[in-house]
From Swiss-Prot:
One of its GO terms (cellular component) is nucleus. The keyword Nucleotide-binding does not apply. GO terms for biological process: chromatin organization; regulation of DNA-templated transcription. InterPro entries: GATAD1, Znf_GATA, Znf_NHR/GATA. PROSITE patterns: GATA_ZN_FINGER_2. This is GATA zinc finger domain-containing protein 1. It comes from the Eukaryota. The lineage of its organism: Eukaryota, Metazoa, Chordata, Craniata, Vertebrata. GO terms for molecular function: sequence-specific DNA binding; zinc ion binding.
Length: 245
């Protein structure tokens, strides 16, 4: 309907209504006339339904009997099918619970511990506490460190966490003497095993020992000990120093 034109009911010709509706043939109806048309349509439907019921009552009794018997037979079949489904589900449930549990696999820890403690690289087993050398690319000098732990990523690349060893004045320039080195700082980032070169095996607590690796003069006489030197130079004769005191 164009904008600005007032609608007009096709039945009562009124121009005012709270609600406008369209009929089955597209005519415009007001709210009162649309209710009257719906009640009239309902009455026609009731008449049609009554006529259909009266026509259906002319059927013979044999037809109703046949339909009732077929419904009863269908009901019996559905009950039997439900019982069969219930029995099948019960069988499945029983067999599921009666299934034997899978045999547990025995985990052997003989080789697992060795893999955690040792790392094979270039045909050599590395372990925690080993002393390795690292060559600096800038100055070409060799630095020594002690292995603190091992790391292996998802691509099987092996790395090692290092603790640097600081040389002293008595440390040799061409080789490595563990008794002349002291423990240094721990490195935060691990280094790949390809950058490391094996030097020697050593206990993990060797450089953290509270007692000095160098021979010291005891403050009180001690018996039952055998004195020997640890450093690269001959030790001081302890017996002579004790005799002088």
């Amino acid at each position: 309907m164009p904008l600005g034109l007032k609608p007009t009911c096709s039945m009562c010709k009124t121009n005012t209504s709270s609600m406008w509706k369209k009929g089955s043939q597209g005519e415009i109806l007001c709210n009162n006339c649309s209710g009257k048309s719906s009640t009239a349509a309902g009455g026609n439907n009731n008449n049609n339904s009554s006529s259909s019921t009266s026509g259906s009552s002319s059927y013979t009794g044999t037809t109703f009997a046949s339909t009732s018997t077929s419904q009863q037979s269908n009901g019996g079949n559905t009950k039997q099918s439900k019982q069969e489904i219930h029995r099948r589900s019960a069988r499945l449930r029983n067999t599921k619970y009666k299934a034997t549990p899978a045999a547990e696999k025995k985990v052997s820890t003989k080789g697992k511990g060795r893999r955690h403690i040792f790392k094979l690289k270039n045909g050599l087993y590395y372990q925690i506490g080993d002393v390795v050398s690292v060559v600096d690319e800038e100055d070409g000098k060799t630095y020594y460190a002690q292995v603190r732990g091992f790391i292996q990523d998802q691509y099987c690349e092996k790395s090692a966490a290092l603790t640097w060893l600081i040389p002293t004045l008595s440390s040799p320039k061409d080789g490595f003497d563990p008794s002349t080195y002291i423990i240094g700082p721990d490195e935060d980032l691990p280094r790949k095993m390809e950058c490391l070169e094996f030097v020697c095996h050593a206990p993990s607590e060797y450089f953290k020992s509270r007692s000095s690796p160098f021979p010291t003069i005891p403050t009180r006489p001690e018996k039952g000990f055998i004195w020997t030197h640890i450093g690269p130079t001959p030790a001081i004769s302890i017996k002579e120093t004790m005799a002088n005191h």
